[in-house]
C-alpha cells in the first residue's frame, strides 16, 4: 500500500506535502501523477449493522494513522439512511490526498489531518466526486470536504460529537434540493420544498411583498430544536428594544421578514429576523445584527445553529456585513431565545402609554381587506361597522392603513381571556385585566413571585370584575371560579415554574440543606484553639442536632422554633468565637429577654403585605451600610434577587466584617447564612399559607354559589335541566364538592373539578359572545374604543395584544398544562423530599464558593424583562389596487347600540 508523496521535515517536525514541487515535477516530465492503491477491497451493498464510534475508527487504523482496513461501512447519526465507508482517498481511486487539506485556514499551523471515509446513502456505493469526505484533525476536530466545490467545513469539535450529530453541521446539506418525503425524513415538518417563499428567497422586493401578504403565517424552524418562525414586516412593529433601531435597519437596506423564538414564547418576547440586500438572514439582538444563515431555506432547516456553532469556520463564509460573536454573546443569544435574558430598563416598554397615530387620529384610518377575503364571514364580522371607500377618490399620498384579514382576526381572539382560557361573560375592560394577569404566568414572563400580583390583590380583582349586561348574574360564579382556579394553580401549586412560591421554597430548602452540610465540615476544620473556645459540649450537641435536622428536613425549616434555636446558636457562637462588645451585648440581651427582645429591625415586605411586619434576624458584624442594604432588599422581594445573584457569582448571600482567624470567620459566615436562608424559607412558608387561606375562602364561597344556582335551575326546569341526567349527575358532584371540599393543601383539584362542571352548564357553555367579540375587535382595531388608558393592566394589554393578532399563538390549553404539573402544598413537597426536582438537587450538591467571605458588594440578579418587540396593527402605506378599503362611519348600519362601554 503506497501512494506518490513528496515529504519535507519542517522545523517543528511536521510532515507536510509540498504541492508546488509536485506540480513542478509533473510539468517537467509531462507525467500524470495518480494515486496508486495496491489494496483491493469490495464494497458491500448490504445495509450496515454497525454504528460509527471511536472504537470502530481506532480498530480500522494501522501504523501511521492510515486506514488499514478499508471498506468497513457504518451507520451515522444524521442524515437518515446514510452510511460512512472507511478508507483513504486512494482506496476510492480519486485524485486527492488527505495531506493536501493540511493547508486549510481552518487548521492551526501544528495540526494535521487523518482520513475517515466517505459519507453516502446506504443504498449505493460512495461517489468520490459527489459525496462528502470526512477527516479528523490531530486536535480532535472533525472535518468534511464538499467534493463538488472543494470547500472544507468543521462539522464537529470531537469524534464523539460527530458520533452524536453526524453531518448536521455540513452546510451543503442545508441547501440541498430534496423531494417531500426525503425533506420530511431529514428536517421534519419544516417547509423548504417548492413553497413560494423559498422560490423568492433570492428576490428581496418580492420577499417583502410576500411577507406583507402572509403576515402571521407560522412555520416550524430547525429540525433539531423546537423553534418557530412567524412572518411579519417592518410596518407591523412599533419598536425593537431601543429607540431608532427600526430607522437604522431600513437605512442599511435590511428588511424585517419575521420573528422567531422557541415554541411557547410570547409574541413580544421573540427575536427579529432580518434579510439583507444580499438575501442572507440575520438576527437582531442586543442592538446588533448578526448573520445566522446564507439563505432563508438554510435558516428554516437549521435555525440559529450556524451562528451558535460559529460558521466562521467555513472557508466560504465571506461577508463584509458579518459580525462574529463571542462565546458570551452566543450564550446571551441562547438565553434570549429561551426567554431568560433580561432587558434592563427603568420601566418595561409594555407598561408605557404609546404615542401612536392609531390613537391620535382615528378618523383618518383606512381599513384594508384583500379582494380574495372580502366575502369571508370573519372579515364581514368587522366590515359591517365600516363604510367602503373608492380608492380613486382618495388623495395619492400615503394613508394610515390597518389590514383586516381572517388570519389576524382569528389570531387576535387569543388576546382575550374568553378564547384563551375559557373565562366567559366579562366586560372587555375586565377581560383585559384577567388576560394580562394569566398570560404572565402562562409564559412565565418574570422569575420572582414578588413581581406578580399576590392573592390579596386577586381577591379584590374578583370582587370588582365587570360583566357584560347580557350575561346572567347568577353564572358569574363560574367565571370567578375559573380565574381563581387558574391563577391559584399557576402561582401556588406549580412547583416546576420559577415564578411560583413553591419553586423558591424548594430552591431555598435545598440551599439550606447544602449549607448545613457545609457547616458541619467547617466545624471539623476548626483549629484546636477555636475548638477549645467553642467548647466541646456545644460542638457535640450542635453536631447531633444537625443530623436530627437533616433527617427530618420535611418540616424542620418551616418551624419557627427551629429558626429561633439556630438564631440563638448564632449569638452564642459569636460570643464564644469573637466576644467583642457588640457580641456580648447581644448575648446578654438575648439571655435576659429571649424572644421578646427586639434583636433586629422590623420590615414590611412590599409584595406580601398579608403577613404584616416581620422581625429580621439578629445579624452581627454586617456594618451599617451593608445592614441597611440587606433590609431594603428583604423589604423589596424577601431578598430572592440578592440570593440568586450571589449564588450565580459563587458567593454566599451574606458576608461578615469581622477580625478573627479565617477558620472562625468561615464558620460564623456559614452559620449567619444558614440563619438568613432559614428565615427566608420560614417567611415564604407563612406567605404560602396566608395565600392558601385566601384562595381557599374564595373557592368555597364561589363553589357554594354555583351549587345553589345549579339546584335552583334544576327545580325551575330551566334550559332543559329538569330531565337532563347529565345535569343531574353534575349537580350531585357539585353538592359533594361543597360538602367535602378536601384538604386545603390540595383544594385546587376540587376547584378544577368544579370548574369542569361549571364549563358544562348549558347556560354558560352556550353563552353568545358576539357582542363581546365586537367590542374587542372594534377597540383593538381602533374603530371604536371602549376605554382609554387609565389602568396599568389596560395599558399593558393594549400594548401586548397586537402581537397576538400578528403571531399565531394557538397553544395547548393552559389548564391542561397545569393539571400535569401541580403538586399539593405540603411540607414534604415544599422541601423537595417528595416528587424531587433532581436538577435542583444536583445543582446544589455541586455548588462551590470562591472567596465569598471577602466580597462586600451585593450582586443582584435582575428581574427578567424579555419583551423586546412591540407590535402595531397599522402603518403608513400606499393604497393598492388588490385591496378594498373601508373607513369608520358613526352612522353605518352595523353601529353598536347600547353597549356598556365607557368611552
Curated annotation (Swiss-Prot):
<dbReference type="InterPro" id="IPR010302">
    <property type="entry name" value="UL27-like_protein_herpesevirus"/>
</dbReference>
<keyword id="KW-1043">Host membrane</keyword>
<dbReference type="GO" id="GO:0016020">
    <property type="term" value="C:membrane"/>
</dbReference>
<keyword id="KW-0472">Membrane</keyword>
<feature type="transmembrane region" description="Helical">
    <location>
        <begin position="665"/>
        <end position="685"/>
    </location>
</feature>
<dbReference type="GO" id="GO:0033644">
    <property type="term" value="C:host cell membrane"/>
</dbReference>
<keyword id="KW-1133">Transmembrane helix</keyword>
<dbReference type="Pfam" id="PF05999">
    <property type="entry name" value="Herpes_U5"/>
</dbReference>
<comment type="similarity">
    <text>Belongs to the herpesviridae US22 family.</text>
</comment>
<keyword id="KW-0812">Transmembrane</keyword>
<protein>
    <recommendedName>
        <fullName>Protein U7</fullName>
    </recommendedName>
</protein>
Amino acid at each position: 500500500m503506497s501512494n506518490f508523496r513528496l515529504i519535507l521535515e519542517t522545523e517543528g517536525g511536521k510532515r507536510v506535502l509540498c504541492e508546488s514541487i509536485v506540480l513542478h515535477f509533473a510539468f517537467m516530465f509531462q507525467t500524470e501523477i495518480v494515486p496508486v492503491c495496491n489494496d483491493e477491497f469490495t464494497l458491500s451493498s448490504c445495509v450496515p449493522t454497525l454504528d460509527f464510534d471511536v472504537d470502530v475508527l481506532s480498530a480500522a487504523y494501522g501504523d501511521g494513522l492510515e486506514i488499514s482496513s478499508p471498506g468497513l461501512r457504518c451507520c451515522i447519526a444524521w442524515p437518515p439512511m446514510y452510511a460512512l465507508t472507511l478508507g483513504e482517498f486512494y482506496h476510492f481511486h480519486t485524485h486527492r490526498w488527505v495531506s493536501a487539506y493540511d493547508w486549510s485556514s481552518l487548521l492551526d499551523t501544528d495540526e494535521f489531518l487523518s482520513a475517515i471515509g466517505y459519507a453516502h446513502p446506504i443504498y449505493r456505493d460512495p461517489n468520490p466526486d459527489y459525496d462528502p469526505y470526512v477527516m479528523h484533525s490531530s486536535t480532535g476536530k472533525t472535518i468534511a470536504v464538499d467534493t463538488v466545490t472543494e470547500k472544507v467545513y468543521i462539522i464537529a469539535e470531537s469524534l464523539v460529537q460527530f458520533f452524536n450529530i453526524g453531518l448536521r453541521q455540513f452546510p451543503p446539506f442545508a441547501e440541498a434540493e430534496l423531494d417531500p418525503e426525503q425533506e420530511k425524513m431529514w428536517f421534519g415538518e419544516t417547509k423548504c420544498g417548492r413553497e413560494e417563499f423559498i422560490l423568492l428567497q433570492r428576490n428581496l422586493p418580492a420577499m417583502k411583498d410576500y411577507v406583507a401578504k402572509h403576515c402571521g403565517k407560522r412555520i416550524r424552524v430547525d429540525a433539531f430544536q423546537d423553534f418557530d418562525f412567524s412572518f411579519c414586516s417592518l410596518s407591523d412593529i412599533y419598536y425593537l428594544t431601543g429607540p431608532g433601531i427600526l430607522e437604522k435597519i431600513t437605512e442599511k437596506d435590511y428588511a424585517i421578514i419575521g420573528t422567531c423564538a422557541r415554541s411557547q414564547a410570547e409574541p413580544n418576547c421573540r427575536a427579529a429576523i432580518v434579510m439583507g440586500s444580499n438575501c442572507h438572514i440575520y438576527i437582531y439582538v442586543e442592538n446588533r445584527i448578526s448573520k445566522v444563515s446564507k439563505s432563508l431555506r438554510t435558516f428554516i432547516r437549521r435555525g440559529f445553529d450556524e451562528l451558535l456553532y460559529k460558521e466562521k469556520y467555513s472557508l466560504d463564509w465571506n461577508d463584509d456585513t458579518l459580525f462574529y460573536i463571542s462565546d458570551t454573546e452566543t450564550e446571551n443569544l441562547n438565553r434570549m431565545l429561551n426567554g431568560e435574558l433580561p432587558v434592563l430598563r427603568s420601566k418595561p416598554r409594555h407598561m408605557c402609554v404609546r404615542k401612536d397615530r392609531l390613537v391620535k387620529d382615528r378618523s383618518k384610518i383606512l381599513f384594508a381587506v384583500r379582494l380574495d377575503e372580502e366575502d369571508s364571514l370573519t372579515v364581514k364580522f368587522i366590515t359591517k361597522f365600516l363604510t367602503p371607500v373608492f380608492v380613486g377618490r382618495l388623495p395619492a399620498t400615503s394613508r394610515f392603513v390597518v389590514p383586516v384579514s381572517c388570519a389576524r382576526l382569528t389570531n387576535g381572539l387569543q388576546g382575550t381571556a374568553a378564547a384563551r382560557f375559557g373565562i366567559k361573560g366579562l366586560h372587555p375592560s375586565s377581560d383585559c385585566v384577567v388576560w394580562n394577569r394569566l398570560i404572565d404566568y402562562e409564559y412565565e414572563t418574570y422569575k420572582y413571585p414578588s413581581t406578580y400580583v399576590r392573592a390579596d390583590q386577586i381577591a379584590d380583582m374578583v370582587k370588582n370584575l365587570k360583566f357584560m349586561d347580557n350575561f346572567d348574574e347568577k353564572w358569574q360564579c363560574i367565571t370567578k371560579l375559573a380565574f381563581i382556579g387558574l391563577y391559584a394553580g399557576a402561582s401556588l401549586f406549580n412547583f416546576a415554574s420559577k415564578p411560583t412560591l413553591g419553586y423558591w421554597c424548594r430552591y431555598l430548602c435545598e440551599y439550606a440543606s447544602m449549607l448545613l452540610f457545609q457547616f458541619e465540615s467547617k466545624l471539623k476544620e476548626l483549629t484546636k484553639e477555636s475548638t477549645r473556645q467553642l467548647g466541646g459540649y456545644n460542638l457535640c450537641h450542635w453536631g447531633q442536632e444537625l443530623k436530627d435536622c437533616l433527617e427530618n428536613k420535611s418540616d424542620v425549616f418551616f418551624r419557627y422554633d427551629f429558626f429561633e434555636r439556630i438564631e440563638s446558636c448564632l449569638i452564642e457562637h459569636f460570643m464564644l468565637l469573637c466576644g467583642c462588645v457588640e457580641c456580648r451585648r447581644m448575648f446578654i440581651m438575648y439571655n435576659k429577654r429571649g424572644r421578646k427582645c427586639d434583636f433586629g429591625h422590623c420590615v414590611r415586605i412590599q409584595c406580601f403585605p398579608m403577613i404584616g411586619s416581620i422581625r429580621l434576624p439578629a445579624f452581627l458584624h454586617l456594618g451599617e451600610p451593608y445592614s441597611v442594604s440587606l433590609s431594603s432588599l428583604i423589604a423589596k422581594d424577601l431578598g430572592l434577587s440578592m440570593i440568586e445573584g450571589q449564588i450565580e457569582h459563587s458567593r454566599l448571600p451574606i458576608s461578615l466584617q469581622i477580625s478573627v482567624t479565617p477558620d472562625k470567620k468561615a464558620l460564623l459566615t456559614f452559620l449567619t447564612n444558614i440563619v438568613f436562608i432559614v428565615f427566608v424559607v420560614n417567611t415564604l412558608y407563612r406567605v404560602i399559607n396566608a395565600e392558601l387561606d385566601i384562595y381557599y375562602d374564595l373557592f368555597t364561597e364561589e363553589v357554594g354559589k354555583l351549587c345553589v344556582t345549579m339546584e335552583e335551575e334544576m327545580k325551575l326546569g330551566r334550559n332543559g335541566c329538569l330531565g337532563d341526567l347529565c345535569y343531574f349527575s353534575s349537580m350531585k358532584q357539585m353538592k359533594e364538592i361543597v360538602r367535602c371540599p378536601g384538604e386545603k393543601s390540595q383544594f385546587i383539584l376540587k376547584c378544577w373539578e368544579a370548574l369542569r362542571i361549571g364549563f358544562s352548564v348549558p347556560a354558560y357553555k352556550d353563552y353568545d359572545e358576539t357582542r363581546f367579540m365586537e367590542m374587542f375587535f372594534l377597540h383593538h382595531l381602533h374603530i371604536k374604543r371602549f376605554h382609554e388608558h387609565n389602568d396599568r393592566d389596560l395599558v399593558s394589554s393594549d400594548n401586548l395584544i397586537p402581537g397576538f393578532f400578528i403571531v399565531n399563538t394557538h397553544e395547548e390549553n393552559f389548564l391542561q398544562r397545569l393539571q400535569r404539573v401541580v403538586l399539593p402544598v405540603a411540607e414534604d413537597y415544599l422541601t423537595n423530599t417528595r416528587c424531587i426536582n433532581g436538577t435542583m438537587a444536583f445543582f446544589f450538591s455541586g455548588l462551590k464558593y470562591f472567596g465569598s467571605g471577602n466580597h462586600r458588594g451585593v450582586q443582584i440578579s435582575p428581574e427578567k424583562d424579555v419583551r423586546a418587540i412591540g407590535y402595531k396593527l397599522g402603518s403608513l402605506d400606499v393604497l393598492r389596487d388588490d385591496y378594498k378599503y373601508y373607513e369608520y362611519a358613526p352612522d353605518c348600519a352595523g353601529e353598536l347600540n347600547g353597549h356598556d362601554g365607557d368611552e
